[in-house]
Regions:
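Hydrophobic alpha-helical segments of membrane proteins
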Residues: 67, 146-153, 193-200, 231-248, ...
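Class A GPCR helix-loop hinge within the 7TM core
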Residues: 100-138, 289-292
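Extracellular N-terminal segment of 7TM GPCRs
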Residues: 1-36, 174-175, 184
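Loop architecture of class A 7-transmembrane GPCRs
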Residues: 3-10, 76-97, 126, 131-137, ...
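Extracellular TM2-ECL1-early TM3 structural module of rhodopsin-like
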Residues: 15-24, 50-109, 117, 125
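Intrinsically disordered regulatory tails of 7TM GPCRs
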Residues: 1-10, 160-162, 218, 258, ...
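Intracellular effector-coupling site of seven-transmembrane GPCRs
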Residues: 165-177, 188-191, 207-244, 262-265
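Internal alpha-helical transmembrane segments of multi-pass membrane proteins, especially GPCRs
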Residues: 56-59, 100, 134-138, 190, ...
């Protein structure tokens, strides 16, 4: 911890405005589009589409994270002061890291699936079945839960090192202790570097095969190039800045007493952490690129929703007209009876 609070001038004003702004936008967009993606992928899973299993898992991870964003907005708005229970802090941090690393894992699974479909369409077909995809998805969820369970068994609320602020930090304390640094380095290797290498190797092989295949139409080649570009760019933009800063923090913080460096690293780290939330928006959009029937499924779902809404509006209007007509009829009958009495 930082002993010399006289030199400690921590400022949480950046977090107070950055996170609520970014997270609010992410939440408003990602919740509806991930719900649509879940429904569309569920339809495809029933049709024995193995790729849809990975898309479903990806959308589920994004939706769970988007649903806890209000807690992180509240935390940032209060100047990085956690005012909820310690257990809720653990659950929120657990779901956040589950989203980070299930997302990278399932993006790697999608890349391998596309590699097998385009480079080895006739070989290894048993690896492109719905059953195999379900098994892989379950294994990913179990492994990620085990790797991130350290969050659920350790204390995750800390007093702000700048003691005069009297803030309670949730999960991301600073400076990092040596054991936290080792866990972070393990996360970087297993959750970031390995999926990144898999994605780059798969798409390099896919690009080579598609480019050299004379039978592939130019339009199909462009689709494959868009797919490669979108998944690679999404992965790099959302996760690379965060993991670079996390790596620097992990090798520097346990062994330095430079307060200014510690605070600078923490601020940059928090900015890159906000950037990772954009994957909740990007992942469902990728669904339109990796599945040929995705756009059709999503459009059908939207039409269905619009039809239901229109039906409800028509029903409400008919009910209002019927009610109005009934009242008018009753009024006419009443007037007629009054005139008869006169």
């Amino acid at each position: 911890t930082m002993n010399n609070t006289a030199e400690c001038h921590d400022d949480h004003s950046l977090d107070k405005y950055l996170f609520p702004f970014v997270y609010s936008i992410v939440m408003m967009i990602s919740i509806p589009i991930n719900c649509i993606s879940l429904c569309a992928s569920c339809v495809q899973v029933r049709k024995k589409n193995e790729l849809a299993v990975y898309i479903f898992s990806l959308s589920l991870a994004d939706l769970l994270y988007a649903l806890i964003l209000p807690l992180w907005i509240d935390y940032a708005w209060n100047g990085d002061d956690w005012r909820r229970s310690a257990l809720l802090c653990q659950i929120s941090a657990f779901l956040m890291y589950m989203n980070f690393y299930t997302s990278t894992a399932f993006l790697a699974c999608i890349s391998v699936n596309r590699y097998l479909a385009l480079v080895h369409p006739l070989k290894l077909q048993h690896l492109r079945t719905r059953r195999f995809s379900l098994i892989v998805s379950i294994i990913v969820w179990i492994l990620e839960s085990i790797l991130n369970s350290v969050i659920l068994v350790n204390k995750e609320v800390f007093n702000d090192p700048c003691n005069f602020t009297n803030h309670t930090l949730c999960y991301d304390n600073y400076p990092l202790e040596w054991w936290q640094s080792w866990i972070n380095l393990l996360r970087i290797c297993l959750g970031y570097l390995i999926p990144l290498i898999i994605i780059l190797v798969c798409y390099h092989k896919i690009y080579q095969v598609v480019r050299c295949n004379q039978a592939t139409l130019d339009e199909e080649k462009q689709k494959v190039k868009k797919l490669i570009l979108n998944i690679t760019v999404t992965f790099i933009i959302c996760f690379t800045p965060y993991h670079i800063v996390l790596f620097i923090r992990s090798i520097k913080e346990p062994y330095t007493k430079d307060l200014q460096l510690l605070q600078l690293l923490y601020k940059v780290y928090r900015i890159t952490q906000a950037l990772t939330s954009l994957n909740c928006i990007a992942d469902p959009i990728l669904y339109c690129f990796v599945s040929e029937t995705a756009r059709t499924d999503i459009l059908n779902l939207l039409r269905c929703c619009l039809c239901l809404q229109k039906h409800e509006e028509d029903h409400a209007r008919d009910h209002a007209l019927c009610s109005s007509a009934t009242k008018s009829s009753a009024l006419i009958t009443y007037r007629a009876s009054c005139e008869a009495e006169i």
